[in-house]
Amino acid sequence: MKRYTTGLLGLLLIASLTTGCKKDKGDPPVLPPAESMVVDFSNFASATKGASFSADAKGTENSTYEFAALTAGVWKLIINTTLIVPVSAFKASFSEAPEYLDDKTWQWSYTFTALSASYTARLTGQTVASEVIWKMYITKTGNGGFTDFLWFEGTSKVDGTGGQWILYQSAQAPQACLQVDWSRSGDSVGKVTYTWIKNSDPFKTSYLEYGMVTGDLDAYFIIHYYTGTKFSDIEIRWNTTTKNGRV
């Protein structure tokens, strides 16, 4: 009887410790929204065709708007080419289930394809106080391969209302090139700002800010760009339904 009681107590102790460990894990941190890394250029692109735009300086609306559209297109090109691998890696994480590591850290591990090549991604999220620290490591095998390259990192608020990303150019040129600051209101991202932070680059500190606001002109771009001799600014606001707006 004594052995039976001792064994039962042992099982209860093990069960208690196991349950306690599960409780200590808590829930995995919520991934920042995909829109926190990728600006939605679709509304702006559709507004470039057949839209009516006015400008503060009469007669300059066409050239100003066309240049703004070109500049926005450059940012879109950067995201869709230079940074397509880390962006694709982040998008793929939403269909994966994380596993608990330790020290309030969870990991998403999976494979994905970008530019006709296969990669392995390892995204970690560690909760520290009111923030989550994110790190994305990417591995490529074969030609031009590399292992566990930290392609981007960042932080987000635990409540999911905002955060920041830092993206590195490539495994061959591992220097920080893009900073993304984002904020969220309700179920949608209210503002995203791309800032070019690559050192020794004349375009450093150039930025593009995209946001959604209330009112008739409910979307906007603010573009701070380098003309080759100086920095200038353009602000574009438009209605996402009618595609009309102003520069």
Where are these regions (language model features)?
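Bacterial Sec-dependent N-terminal signal peptides
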Residues: 2-42
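Low-complexity, intrinsically disordered segments exposed to solvent
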Residues: 26-247
